[in-house]
A protein has these predicted regions:
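Generic recognition of short, well-ordered alpha-helical interface segments
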Residues: 12, 112-115, 151, 168
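Metal-assisted phosphate- and nucleotidyl-transfer catalytic regions
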Residues: 39-45, 123-202
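Short amphipathic alpha-helices in soluble, non-transmembrane regions
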Residues: 118-119
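Class II aminoacyl-tRNA synthetase-like tRNA-binding/catalytic domains
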Residues: 1-112, 122, 199
Length: 202
């Protein structure tokens, strides 16, 4: 019964998501799963071969690039519930095959979209939870009613690491990451370093 409930919950989430995006004027689209370039995210792709064209192709890691083409082509609001594939590790945050929703809304700035997504989560939770915005997990009761607390990326890292990022060199960041036992790759740029440190400390 528990597994059956999970399938039902997933179906409800998809229906409610479509309702929310459609009523806001979004167009749902399908973009190619087989792609000639593995783009849209920094991730290891699955590689396959197209026999008729005799070329290697990739299962998409994200729908981003095709959705952005639609924005450039004049579609101001697009979204996709995309099946994506990443040939990486498996843990509580990673699965090689997964569904994600990706959406673009032209001419809207990030603070508007943050508030709009808060309303989406509130709508979603109410829809699956008999009108209640509160959900109990193993430890806490989480209330999805907005507004949500805002956390500034730089301020949060400055506080967690007890440094000023504006005055911290890339080499110093690498040293901090190594001290934290992060498996630092020499190809990592400053952005990747900051992202990994954020995941570890914030």
């Amino acid at each position: 019964p528990k597994v059956k409930d999970t399938f039902k919950l997933r179906s409800d989430v998809i229906k409610l998501t479509r309702q929310y995006f459609d009523k806001e004027g979004f167009i749902e689209v399908d973009t190619p799963v087989l792609q000639s370039v593995a783009g849209g995210a920094t991730a290891e792709p699955f590689i396959t071969h197209h026999n008729a064209l005799d070329i290697d192709m990739y299962l998409r890691v994200a729908p981003e690039l095709y959705l952005k083409r639609l924005i450039v082509g004049g579609y101001d609001q697009v979204y996709e519930m995309a099946r994506c594939f990443r040939n990486e590790g498996i843990d509580h945050q990673h699965n090689p095959e997964f569904t994600q929703i990706e959406a673009y809304w032209a001419y809207k700035e990030y603070s508007f979209l943050m508030e709009w997504m808060e309303k989406y989560f509130e709508f979603l939770v109410k829809g699956i939870n008999n009108g209640d915005t509160k959900i109990k997990n193993a430890k806490d009761i989480i209330d999805f009613k907005g507004p949500y607390p805002r956390l500034d990326f730089k301020e949060a890292l400055d506080k967690a690491l007890k440094i000023d990022l504006d005055k911290t060199s890339d080499k110093e960041l690498v040293d901090i990451a190594k001290q934290a036992k992060l498996d630092v790759d020499k190809t990592w740029g400053r952005g990747k370093l900051l992202d990994e440190l954020y995941k570890k400390f914030v």
